[in-house]
Design a protein with these regions (language model features):
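Exposed low-complexity, polar/acidic, P/S/T/G-rich flexible segments that act as propeptides
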Residues: 326-357
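Short beta-strand-plus-loop segments that form exposed binding edges in beta-rich domains
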Residues: 317-325
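A short acidic/small-residue loop/turn micro-motif
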Residues: 290-298
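Carbohydrate-binding surfaces of carbohydrate-active enzymes
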Residues: 1-215, 349
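Exposed aromatic-hydrophobic patches
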Residues: 119-120, 256, 299-308
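Aromatic-lined ligand-binding clefts that engage carbohydrates, nucleic acids, or primary amines
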Residues: 262-285, 292-293, 318
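Short beta-strands within extracellular/lumenal beta-sheet-rich domains
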Residues: 248-261, 299-301
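Edge strands and adjacent loops of beta-rich recognition modules
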Residues: 227-254
Length: 357
């Protein structure tokens, strides 16, 4: 595969600029589970059912598995999502399996297309032995003699638990007290905002991190500096790395003029461009400082990463290349890109605000 020279973002959960993406929020729940709920998960044996088919494109059955210890305590995992495939909903999914001669029957559930989750069975929390808890575990701690547990709602599934065969509902977003156990089931939407820091829960938007004992939250503000920035098409420039645009089409050149003091007045500003071309490169003078392979028609650039260049010269040059019917234009795109277009426009220039929680 062909790759950019600079931009190795690859749609990671944490972007190259440190922003937490939506799938990063989802992945954080898994990380918290491993670090703050069950540190022994990796020692549990994985079990898989006999598949109806070995065809990787077969979406007629639910992909699922179990991880369990020798005592039959573990987790049921289910997934109705695979990139490039379109699953249907699964109705009345019933699961039964045997571990160490003991048969375990899990509750019947409906699994929505696109859903991915897991929940525990035969698990002890505090002094309570649960048959199962139909919610995804995230974190637990001890407080005032109680085991306090945080769960996330499994997408599209009403949370409940079973103790000695007796089923009881679990309320969302409030305490469920069962003997010496407190269970909080966070709604599916709110769970994406959940953070667990030093044994305390936080619900925060944006990118959250700790620095010298402080909890900081970075968010894109409503302050838009777009009208203070100009993007104009300009004449051809002699610049290096032309081949790495991987297009046989005609190049286009843009001049991006930024306010000279933009990074003295603001810690960071995120530029968002609408882009219909194949690839682009950004230059400060003759030095390439950024590039982008078009995966979603949204070119993002956080200015703080380029502070040393902007302070020397607040004008940057952007060179674009179009997608063509024939030629090299075979780089990785997840969306349809129009042929022969170099269209680039500045959609917004939002100030990034950092606040202590």
């Amino acid at each position: 595969n062909d790759y950019p020279i600079i931009d190795y973002d690859f749609q990671a959960p944490i972007s190259r600029y440190g922003a937490c993406r939506a799938h990063g929020d989802r992945l954080r729940l898994m990380h918290l589970f491993i670090s703050d709920f069950d540190t022994e998960i990796s020692t549990k044996q994985a079990y898989f059912p006999k598949w109806n088919s070995t065809d990787p494109m077969d979406i007629s059955f639910l992909k699922c598995s179990v991880r369990s210890d020798n005592d039959g305590s573990g987790y049921f995992f289910a997934g109705a999502y695979e990139k490039g495939l379109k699953y249907n909903d699964f109705k009345d999914v019933q699961v039964a399996f045997s571990i160490q001669g003991k048969t375990i029957n899990l509750p019947s559930i409906d699994v929505k297309a696109g859903a991915m989750f897991f929940y525990p069975f035969n698990i002890q929390l505090g002094s309570v032995q649960f048959d199962y808890i139909l919610a995804q575990p995230v974190a637990k701690t001890q407080k005032d003699g109680k085991t306090v547990c945080y769960f996330a709602q499994c997408e599209g599934i009403t949370p409940k638990c079973s103790i000695n065969g007796k089923v009881q509902a679990l309320a969302l977003d409030e305490e469920n007290s069962i003997d010496d156990v407190s269970i909080y089931v966070i709604s599916y939407k709110e769970a994406k905002r959940f953070h667990f820091i030093d044994g305390k829960p936080y619900f925060l938007d944006g990118t959250v991190y700790c620095d010298n004992g402080k909890i900081l939250c970075e968010q894109v503000s409503d302050i838009d500096l777009k009208n203070e920035i100009t993007l104009t098409q300009t004449s051809k420039r002699k610049l290096p790395y032309n081949h790495y645009l991987l297009s046989t089409g005609k190049r286009c050149y843009y001049e991006l003029k930024l306010p000279e003091n933009i990074l003295k007045e603001h810690k960071d500003v995120v530029l968002e461009f609408d882009f219909d071309g194949l690839n682009l490169q950004v230059f400060s003078g003759n030095r390439i400082i950024n590039d982008y392979f078009n995966i979603d028609r949204k070119f993002i650039m956080n200015l703080r990463d380029y502070k040393e260049y902007i302070e020397k010269d607040s004008t940057l040059i952007i060179r674009t290349a179009p997608k063509t019917k024939f030629g090299v234009s075979n780089v990785y795109n997840e969306i349809e890109i129009p042929l022969h277009s170099n269209a680039l426009s500045l959609a917004s220039a939002k100030v990034i605000k950092t606040e202590e929680v």
